Amino acid sequence: MRALWIMAVLLLGVEGHLMQFENMIKKVTGRSGIWWYGSYGCYCGKGGQGLPQDASDRCCFVHDCCYGKVNGCDPKDDFYVYSSENRDIVCGEDNPCTKEICECDKAAAICFRDNMDTYQNKYWFYPSSNCNEESEPC
């Protein structure tokens, strides 16, 4: 029951395009991004520090790095256009900045799908106090 309450609170914090990212993850992996990756390891969810704990957490680390390279728009608020067919995502956008956001999200969703076998429940709601190592450069 506590986990459901926490997920409800996390959903309240999802704004703008982050719901698009949630939908994209669900289309590519068949899983809810908020439920499975909303608070996972050292990088999935809000913030990020230390070293990624496994390949799934590394997907979030790389996603954070990708967002850090986006210039001219806000990756967490700006909307983009994409289509999907059979779990394939096509970012279709005239605006190069929002297309870049879409490509970051697409890469993360594919990474989650390709690394689903690395997901470990012990990293779900992993305490940030365990993420004290020096972070890798992007």
Swiss-Prot record:
Binding positions for Ca(2+) per the UniProt entry: Y43, G45, G47, D64
Q: Please state what the protein is called.
A: Acidic phospholipase A2 Ts-A6
Q: Give the co-factor note.
A: Binds 1 Ca(2+) ion.
- Which lineage is the organism of this entry classified under, starting from the top rank? Eukaryota, Metazoa, Chordata, Craniata, Vertebrata
Where does it primarily localize?
A: secreted
Q: Which cofactor does it need?
A: Ca(2+)
Family stated for the protein in its record: Belongs to the phospholipase A2 family. Group II subfamily. D49 sub-subfamily.
- Cite the InterPro entries for this sequence: PLipase_A2 (IPR001211), PLipase_A2_Asp_AS (IPR033112), PLipase_A2_dom (IPR016090), PLipase_A2_dom_sf (IPR036444), PLipase_A2_His_AS (IPR033113)
